[in-house]
């Protein structure tokens, strides 16, 4: 993921969200105006303006719905407006995390956001419970990528990652649960592209 040297955020405009500096060290997330002069408008080949479609700005709603369905009973249903609400929230969350990671790059005068920047941003923004398992995933992913290059690409990175992410590897990394505002305990859900089932970890498979 790359960013321009003069930019204070990375591709935030593509998510329909802008980020501005306050005091040179903080971001404020602001929605774009939904007007004809919005940054989401562009000129087509005929010179007329055409707004970007929602599917071009947000994550595919089918993928969002698939993840949501994994958290409800098989007989449960999800209303369209609920899917659209989560779709927009997820896109804003991506911009939120990326903006914080971008600020770190800006301070260190780097142009590329790496995995450590994302983990640092999540820790800074209060998502500490997810940092350790994601750190482990990032480490295993990089090891799998190195192995792929070493053997000429005969084994894909995700295959190598699937083999190394065992139940034992996650035993001491995942918290038992999260405590919500009402005092209820929630299980931690980890989203991976690995097809190996890990006992005690609920996984979402992406096709």
UniProtKB/Swiss-Prot annotation:
GO BP term (any one): positive regulation of transcription by RNA polymerase II
Region (Disordered): 27-52
Locations listed in the record: Nucleus
InterPro entries, per database record: CBFA_NFYB_domain, Histone-fold, Transc_fact_NFYB/HAP3, Transcrpt_fac_NFYB/HAP3_CS
Matches recorded under SUPFAM superfamilies: Histone-fold
Signal peptide (residue range): none
The protein's assembly and partners: Heterotrimeric transcription factor composed of three components, NF-YA, NF-YB and NF-YC. NF-YB and NF-YC must interact and dimerize for NF-YA association and DNA binding. Interacts with C1QBP.
The record's note on its domains: Can be divided into 3 domains: the weakly conserved A domain, the highly conserved B domain thought to be involved in subunit interaction and DNA binding, and the Glu-rich C domain.
Protein name: Nuclear transcription factor Y subunit beta
